[in-house]
């Protein structure tokens, strides 16, 4: 008889279960309290109950745990310095959506060579999240794959659904199940309406299918996530200007949704020129000083060293430099945080 299934797949390995990984890298009571508390602080900012600014900042993607921990240690000092004005959260992205092809992140390919040691990647991701949270720094990530969230979501304080997946029904269902606040990016073309639709969908209850923590395929009912919000990330042109923010708020108001959003300094808003993130920062700071309450948070891409590098077989990587989108360096990061904190002073 002719085979009619699995004609285009080859088995690589068995996947560890979320329970097994969590037993190897368990959450302590102090880390659990830290994650819970940081989520609550973020929720209050998104609801307008806390005038401080949510700042999600860090490397475009994680590829080197040592460099990531050095960055986290320096970021913790900035958290303490600016805690009265900023709620700083570290960007810890382990999955990378691709327009066509490319390295898909630490979880999929931790060795950067196409060997796809996913179990090792999951282990590295969970270990790093534990260490960063133990430092006292909350973590943020994009939820891209429908399964991998089961391995790390208990350590995430703020999540995103990316521009390429905001319109996806299964990602909206996943967002409705997540225990952290979730931001939805506008589409790659700049369309913010799809993000508003995603917020509305994720607030509702859904049925969806997923493996549970022990790997058993399960039918889940979600209760809905009341903390969905737009992330303005630009598109064919930037959308961080005051008129863009006002237009997005008008759409939110139309559907009786909270008129609070997050502005991404990178991606379409910097037109893929990473140093322009500083220009976006200046504009947003002025909007805050002018009395804008709609801007609840910002995102920025920064690392220890400026720019980006290519993965070249047989050649060592430059320590502390991105291998995906170019990032601001640490010195610029400190300047950016200082400017944001000074602008938020006007809210007090």
Curated annotation (Swiss-Prot):
GO terms (BP aspect): amino acid biosynthetic process; aromatic amino acid family biosynthetic process; chorismate biosynthetic process
Organism the protein comes from: Salmonella typhi
Gene Ontology MF terms: 3-deoxy-7-phosphoheptulonate synthase activity
Record gene name: aroH
Keywords, alphabetical: Amino-acid biosynthesis, Aromatic amino acid biosynthesis, Transferase
Cross-referenced Pfam families: DAHP_synth_1
Family: Belongs to the class-I DAHP synthase family.
Catalytic activity: D-erythrose 4-phosphate + phosphoenolpyruvate + H2O = 7-phospho-2-dehydro-3-deoxy-D-arabino-heptonate + phosphate
Known function: Stereospecific condensation of phosphoenolpyruvate (PEP) and D-erythrose-4-phosphate (E4P) giving rise to 3-deoxy-D-arabino-heptulosonate-7-phosphate (DAHP).
Documented EC number(s): 2.5.1.54
GO CC annotations, alphabetized: cytoplasm
Stated name of the protein: Phospho-2-dehydro-3-deoxyheptonate aldolase, Trp-sensitive
Pathway participation: Metabolic intermediate biosynthesis; chorismate biosynthesis; chorismate from D-erythrose 4-phosphate and phosphoenolpyruvate: step 1/7
